[in-house]
Amino acid sequence: MATKFATGSSKGDNSFEVGKNAAQQAMEGLSGAEPSLALVFCSSVYDYDEVVKGVRSLTKDTVLVGSSSAGAFTEKGVAPKSVVVGLISTDTYKVHAGIGTGLRESPAKAVEEALKGIPTTIEGYPHISAIILQDGLAGKGEETSLMTAATFGQEAHLFGGAAGDELEFKATTVICNDKCLEDAVSICVIHSKRPLLGGVKHGHKA
């Protein structure tokens, strides 16, 4: 099975329906393939818990990570004050995720909590990548990355970023499966048969 990636975006007044609509668009883009990972980026104007419920009404128990945002985009363009969902379907990845709290006080403990129970190696999937999404107001980006790298080694590829809140700088939230928390870090670990590649910047104009 080839790896497929599809996106959807939606906005509106009902947080559950907005999440569901964005997920529905992404599901249609997979053309019937089952999702292996859901990525959700949600404007702070929405109720995060309701958005996640809407997404998971379609993706079910698929591993889900995400965060609040200060603007999002898909390949179709910029999507301000919206919910954006990306779905990956693949048989060449093994995906796990966890969330750790108390990031401000102890990044080490938060990362340890997030990674608890996640295997460091999986036979047949030699490459390791991690998507690190953290409370953008905690100010612990460097520490969080270093702690994750220390767990998986120098060969691990690290991606991710900090949660936003439409530039209000009041509260930022990260998401892991059905949990939406502040002062936390959400980490998705991907073991893959081939290395994952990262990109910097995008093709959209301001």
Residue map of PLM features:
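Cofactor- and metal-binding active-site motifs of prokaryotic enzymes
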Residues: M1-A206
